[in-house]
Each structure stands twice: as C-alpha cells, then as structure tokens.
Amino acid sequence: MKEIYEVRMHGRAGQGAKSGSQLLAEAAFKEGKYIQSFPEYGSERRGAPTVAYTKISQTELRSHEPVLHPDAVLVLDFGIMRSIAVAAGLQEQGILIVNTKVCAADIQKLAGFSGPTYSIDATSISLDLLATDTPNVPMLGALIKLTGVVRLESLESVLREHFLPKLGEEKVRKNIEMLHIGYDEVTK
C-alpha cells in the first residue's frame, strides 16, 4: 500500500457515505493503520449530496484536509454524476467504483475519467437484503476486492461491533452478506 491511501465517497444523505467512510477507517485501524474519516455536507437534509473522506496510512496522519487527489472514488448514487465532477482529482492509476447497472465505458464518458472503472448494482443488493437504499456496504466489498486496502475479515468484525447492539444478529448477518456480494459481483 502507498504511504497514504485516500478514498472519497460521493452519495446522498441517508445512503451511508459517512458511515461507510467510518467503517472503512475502523477496519484499517483494526489492522494497526493510522486513519482519518470525516464527512462534508451541503444542506443537511435526506437526499442532499454528501461526500465523505477516508485516509489510511502506515504512519501518523498530521493534516486534516479534504481528499483532493483520491486513490479511489466510490459513487453511491449514479444520478449525482450529472451535477458533480466525481472523478475530479482522481489519480490516473486510481479507481472509480459506481453504484449502477451502467457499463464502465458509459460511466467513463459521463465522469470524464479514462482510468480503471467498475460498476456494481449495490442499490439492488441493499434493497433485496435490507429493503433500504443503503449501498455503502456492498460498495465497500467491491473496494476491498479491487484494492485490498483492508482485509474482508477486518470489515466483517467492524460490522459486527457496530451493528450488533443497534440492529441485532439478523441485520448484521445481512450486512455481512451484502459485503460479500459486493466483493463477488463488482464488474469492469
């Protein structure tokens, strides 16, 4: 892994960009890495565009700035790509993962990005298993498969710790299942 691995998640309020960023950071922390995770909001209402940042490093992180040149961008809501330049600053060798059924070539045209681009229908996965549009966990599964930035087992552990007291065993099991489906189904 490079010195600092940076991830930017774009979504809409209520889709889990903030919690996805936190879950990823906590999984990295479990592995002994230094982390930062923080959101940036526009108007704070459900459905408003949001962005969340995660920084993961083997050494102490001293600056607390937005991620301008990410190694990976996750887009939880395909529709925001029409109004937000989600690939802005994305490293040339970075990856773009989008929650959509649209093929990578069409995503690249819309995003203005020619680098590695992947899609996963994370909304359908979350609707099928949880009956809610919270695509963050399947998107994290895709990110882990494509980058290895954290181990799948680390994120499973964080999901258990985070959600068991709040949601119970059944929803934890479904979140872990969504993580694995995201890992298995991401496509180029």
What is each of the regions a protein language model found here?
Residues 1-188:
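Active-site cofactor/cluster-binding pocket
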